Amino acid sequence: MLLCDRAFAGADTLATSYALSLAIKRLCPDFVFCGRQSVDGDTGQVGPSLAVRLGFSLVTNVMSLESAENGLFYTDRLGNGGNISAPAVITLEKSRKLRLPSIRSKIKPIEILSANDINADISLCGLKGSPTR
């Protein structure tokens, strides 16, 4: 899934998490994985904001994950660990080696969604929905 619309241009983390949360709700995932930072910022706010908007549990700065009986067992960057059950947003501390995509993912078309497709309030998207400038 790819969100692509001029309405999303100039978004800060608040507007970004708003648009992403609407798209994620369409998928009904058990877990949402986020990085610690983006290429254009280092605030670390999108993952936690998504958790709030989605009403999911949140674990941040995760270094490792393992399957557990009732969800996932995580270890964070301080060496603390615990279990987290679905639904949850998990922010990962370090980049991982990318695995080669499966053949199915190579040929599956990417669904492109606009602000209208996710029923977004345009006043909350992009530069219009960004209190930081």
Q: Where do the language-model regions lie?
A:
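N-terminal glycine-rich FAD/FM-binding segment characteristic of electron-transfer flavoproteins
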Residues: 1-133
